[in-house]
Amino acid sequence: ASTDIYHRMFHGPRFQPLIGVVASIQDENGRGIEARVHAIKDIPNPELFNTGAGEKQPMMLAHPMLIESCFQTAGLTSMDIDGVDSLPVGARRIVLSDEISGGSLTVLSVRTGSSSDSSTLHNSVIRLDGAPVLKIDGLRMKSMAFLDASERPGLIDSE
């Protein structure tokens, strides 16, 4: 549940796009998790930009909180596999769909590797009713602090 996720993460209520983890996953690239994401209309603070009277909200192809959900899911994956709190510091490529409409949203994050500077690499995908609508390849998460074994979320099935 989201209360379990955000008990471990420092994100305030306006930055909590994840509803809960639904599965531990493994593919040819690595292990990770799949989580449910709030519908666009239900993501906290959908209007992130301050606009004056009469100004229009900027048009966006993808809601910023969907990208944030990729970051948070990769962070949860690193907490579980590597025992670290981490923050996003870069990505090799981000691919967005032309339009992201309503439907059931999930995010998958698979840890694909690590580097000598204690960063981890992830591939993350947002799916709408099972079809990919946003993909981040080579998401790099930088380790910020080590966790005690008791602080790991225990979301990913052991090998």
Predicted regions and their residues:
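A conserved, well-ordered hydrophobic junction motif at loop->secondary-structure transitions
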Residues: 1-159
